[in-house]
Design a protein with these regions (language model features):
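Extended amphipathic alpha-helical scaffolding segments in membrane-proximal extra-membrane regions
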Residues: 80-223
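Divalent-cation
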Residues: 1-126, 130
C-alpha cells in the first residue's frame, strides 16, 4: 500500500506504482508512506525520486540495526518503530526506513507503525508536511513517547513484583523476572542505536539553516 499526502490534499492511495509521477508534484512538500509493498515496487519508487542505490539496498534488507546515512544533502535512516504492544513491555518492533529530502519524506515499513499512525491522524499533519524534517521528528517523537510510557508502566509492575519476591518467590516468579530483564536489555540496545542516530541528524542539520522550531524539535528528540 502506498499513501501519498500532499499539503493541499487528503491522503491518496496508489495501487499502481506507475501512477506516482502523475499524482505527485515533486516541487511541493509531500509525504509518501509505503507499507507492505513488494521489493520491486519499493525500489522502483525510491529510485524514481532520486534515492541513493546503497540506501535502497539497505531499506530492502530485514533486521538491520538502526543507522543514519548522509547522501548528497539528503538523509536516510533505519529505525525500530513500534508495531504493537502487549502487557509488561512485550513490544513487537517494526523496521522502518526514512528518506528525507528538501520537500519530501518517504517512509517504508512492512507492518503498521504506531508513530506513522499517530502522525497520519494528527490534526496538525498538513502543517508538519511543509517541513519533512519536522514531520520525521513528530513520527519519531510519538514512538519515543510510547516507549517511555511502556517503560514507566513496567516500572510500576516491577516494584510490586520485587516486593512479592522479597516475601516469597517461586521459580515461575524468577522466570518472569528474567523475561522482564531481557526485554529491558533489548530496549536499552535499541535506545542506544536511536540516540546515536539523533546525534548524527543534529550534526547534519547544524550545518544547514533551520528555523527555531525545527531546531527545538531536533533537540527535544535527543533529550
Amino acid at each position: 500500500m502506498i499513501r501519498v499526502q500532499q499539503q493541499d490534499k487528503n491522503f491518496t492511495y496508489i495501487s499502481n506504482i506507475k501512477d506516482i509521477d502523475s499524482l505527485v508534484n515533486k516541487e511541493q512538500p509531500c509525504w509518501i508512506d509505503i507499507e507492505n509493498e513488494t521489493n520491486e515496487n519499493i525500489a522502483s519508487l525510491l529510485i524514481s525520486f532520486g534515492c541513493h542505490e546503497l540506501a535502497v539496498h539497505d531499506v530492502l534488507k530485514k533486521n538491520l540495526p538502526p543507522k543514519f546515512e548522509d547522501f548528497e544533502g539528503s538523509i536516510f535512516m533505519l529505525y525500530k518503530g513500534i508495531g504493537s504492544v502487549k502487557e509488561n513491555l512485550d513490544i513487537k518492533h517494526v523496521q522502518m526506513g526514512f528518506f528525507v529530502k528538501e520537500n519530501l519524506l518517504i517512509s517504508i515499513h512492512e507492518e503498521p507503525s504506531f508513530g506513522i499512525e499517530a502522525a497520519k491522524n494528527n490534526k496538525d499533519l498538513l502543517k508538519w508536511i511543509k517541513t519533512p524534517l519536522l514531520l520525521l521528528c513528530k513520527i519519531l517523537d510519538s514512538s519515543a513517547l510510547k516507549y517511555l510510557d511502556e517503560i514507566l508502566q513496567l516500572d510500576h509492575v516491577l516494584a510490586e513484583f520485587e516486593d512479592k519476591i522479597a516475601v516469597i518467590g517461586t521459580d515461575d516468579d524468577l522466570t518472569t523476572l528474567t523475561a522482564y530483564k531481557t526485554r529491558l536489555r533489548r530496549l536499552r540496545r535499541i535506545a542506544n542505536y536511536h540516540e546515536k542516530i539523533i546525534i548524527e541528524i543534529i550534526k547534519f542539520y547544524d550545518q544547514r539553516k533551520l528555523c527555531a522550531e525545527d531546531k527545538h524539535h531536533l533537540k527535544d528528540l535527543h533529550v
